[in-house]
Amino acid sequence: MAVQKNKPTRSKRGMRRSHDALTTALLSVDKTSGENHLRHHITTDGYYRGRKVINR
């Protein structure tokens, strides 16, 4: 098993963790129903880009 020779510095630790930040979900408002939904996904009513695509 590999064992480190020296303790990594706070700077190196921070550089390694720089890509670990969480991002918020991008929400859009539907043109027809005014409902919030994820980008490139249909709403719960079945609308996508203002058109009815699924009968629910």
UniProtKB/Swiss-Prot annotation:
<dbReference type="GO" id="GO:0003735">
    <property type="term" value="F:structural constituent of ribosome"/>
</dbReference>
<dbReference type="InterPro" id="IPR002677">
    <property type="entry name" value="Ribosomal_bL32"/>
</dbReference>
<keyword id="KW-0687">Ribonucleoprotein</keyword>
<protein>
    <recommendedName>
        <fullName>Large ribosomal subunit protein bL32</fullName>
    </recommendedName>
</protein>
<feature type="compositionally biased region" description="Basic residues">
    <location>
        <begin position="7"/>
        <end position="16"/>
    </location>
</feature>
<dbReference type="InterPro" id="IPR011332">
    <property type="entry name" value="Ribosomal_zn-bd"/>
</dbReference>
<feature type="region of interest" description="Disordered">
    <location>
        <begin position="1"/>
        <end position="21"/>
    </location>
</feature>
<dbReference type="GO" id="GO:0006412">
    <property type="term" value="P:translation"/>
</dbReference>
<dbReference type="Pfam" id="PF01783">
    <property type="entry name" value="Ribosomal_L32p"/>
</dbReference>
<keyword id="KW-0689">Ribosomal protein</keyword>
<dbReference type="GO" id="GO:0015934">
    <property type="term" value="C:large ribosomal subunit"/>
</dbReference>
<dbReference type="InterPro" id="IPR044957">
    <property type="entry name" value="Ribosomal_bL32_bact"/>
</dbReference>
<comment type="similarity">
    <text>Belongs to the bacterial ribosomal protein bL32 family.</text>
</comment>
